[in-house]
Amino acid sequence: MSVIKKIILLNLFIILFSATQIVAGNLNILFKNLQNAQNIHEAEKLEKKIWDDWTKHPNSKYLTNKLENATYSMNHQQYQIALKLFTDIINEDPKWAEAWNKRATLYFLIGNYDDSLKDIEQVLNIEPRHFGALSGRAQIYLSYKQYEKAVDDLQQAKTIYPLIKSAKSIEVIKKIIKDLQI
């Protein structure tokens, strides 16, 4: 390989690595601010910014566009198309948490909870602060009547995002657990 090609490749690597670091740094700031949000309006604005970051691939506009197309298909009940697109994205970049999360959502929508849980595990391995994945897994645990696990996930989501709306159901679920023990 020529010296010029090596320099070009090195520069591309540096640019891509830098973009990834900027996104990670931005997310860290957003999560810190989310934990300290004083009201729901402020928290929801931060939540939207986090989702915006999660749904944008750090290095590939192509993958971002593909995720948008897959999400559109999912939202319009074109589930087979969406599944293929989400799976293609995961195969192209298995370290992009949001691709796994979107496919987990699709599996949830079509009632395939076991595969949804598997994808949620991947999401949380990549991005442990993914309050959306935690809330989604809690919904699945509720459908399986695994109430303690649902509470654990909702409490974990609340630790990350203290004003998250899904945390309001924690006390209701705890009451269900208590009633079942009687």
Each predicted region: which residue ranges?
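Residue register within tetratricopeptide repeats
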Residues: 41-44, 80, 114, 148
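Canonical tetratricopeptide repeat
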Residues: 102, 136, 169-170
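Terminal, low-structured helical/coil segments at or just beyond the last alpha-helical repeat
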Residues: 29, 56, 152-182
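Residue-level recognition of tetratricopeptide repeat
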Residues: 96, 130, 147, 163-164
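Register position in tetratricopeptide repeats
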Residues: 75, 109, 143-144, 176-180
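Alpha-helical adaptor scaffolds
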Residues: 60-126
